[in-house]
Amino acid sequence: MEQSSLKFIRNFCIVAHVDHGKSTLADRLLEMTGTVQMRDMRSQLLDSNPIERERGITIKLAPVRMTYRMNNVQGTMYNENQNEIIHSSLYILNLIDTPGHVDFNYEVSRSLAACEGAVLVVDATQGVQAQTLANLNLARKQNLTIIPVINKIDLPNAQIAKVIGELSSLGFRKEEIIAISAKNGTNVDQVLEAIVSVVPAPNGSTSSPLRALIFSSQYDPHKGVVCYVRVVDGSIIAGPAVSISPQIHPQGDPGFGAPRARVTRLQFIASGVEVDPIEVGYFMPKMLKSRGLETGEVGYIATGLKDVALAKVGDTITAQSSVFSSRFSDKSLSVGQLTGKQKTEKQISDNREQKTDNRVIPLPGYKEPKPMVFLGLFPIESDKVSEVRDALGKLRLSDSAFSYKPISSLALGHGFHCGFLGLLHAEVVQERLSREFGLNLLATAPTVEYKIKIKNQR
């Protein structure tokens, strides 16, 4: 991808208080951009976990790649971020839908780190709420461009003028506030136009060594650890040297179809482990295999790793060699020399310092969340302890906000002391352990940490 092609990418997330209409707005965006056919549409499409759909809340962040053609611009214009907006150009919109409940706020903070913009949704009947302010502050700390949106204007008890006043008091101009009905699709096209016109394009370097931020992950029995990544610099190509069709890039960049060297090995900077990617691709919203991920794009990397501890959220992925280029710089280099044996087992290098001394600076990671509620989980069957340990490790891969450590009780035997961000978080984790891993667990009463102040040294 040429550096100029970055101007056609927008990375943004939707944030709001719980039940203010984030998922409904995401549904309308998917529908209006043609990402999902009408026959396949259903409410809360990005909430793929059955628990999310049953409870009516978003628990885990969900990325999706959309395309949108800007037709309401005549000629060429520039926005306040000096983005060049071109008439009839096709833009790649990478959306990350986020939870609204405070117990899953860590998911929001990880999403924001992968974006340049945020759509802040406020319910017209409720106005600004606690998580509205919390998410707004998180977005501002990340220096994101924020698009204020008032949702549910179709309801008879909507107080649009009042909510506009509340948003104005938070520093937004009245003319930039968009009033919509995500349910009916009213004015949602204005949100799409604002995303293209207001949110800045990624500012990564296509010629720099590969740097990709892991903002989430999951475990697949066949593909191993699947990392959700935002490519900040450089590019990654999976498979042998190929010529990529210009149609993959919306602008048909003539240089985009040039031969590409395979990244024979990727490296996780924090753990030092090296892998050959089994598969890379986009979220459409289901995983769709592609031939590569370019600078500024959001997608996934199937690593083949079976040890979930080696791929941590917040880590930086780079090429094992920092001299990777998307075009062959040495014409004498053969495809055979570029192809390496696929590895699916962990590879901790003995000479890690030498291999990471490639002048690639790791991206800022994430601050570990502090658990607020604690409880013990013990298997009903004492011989299932190892299964519980494996399940907790795999579950933590997709929910890094909870922690666990082994404990032993005279009455209950061996188990795990687990920390959560709240009671709802604890309930969801226990339900996932039961449904996804078939575990029968005994949970102790929830507790919180106490701070003890000793007086007179007694």
Residues covered by each model-derived region:
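Structural and coupling elements of P-loop NTPases
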Residues: 1-72, 78-250, 257-321, 335, ...
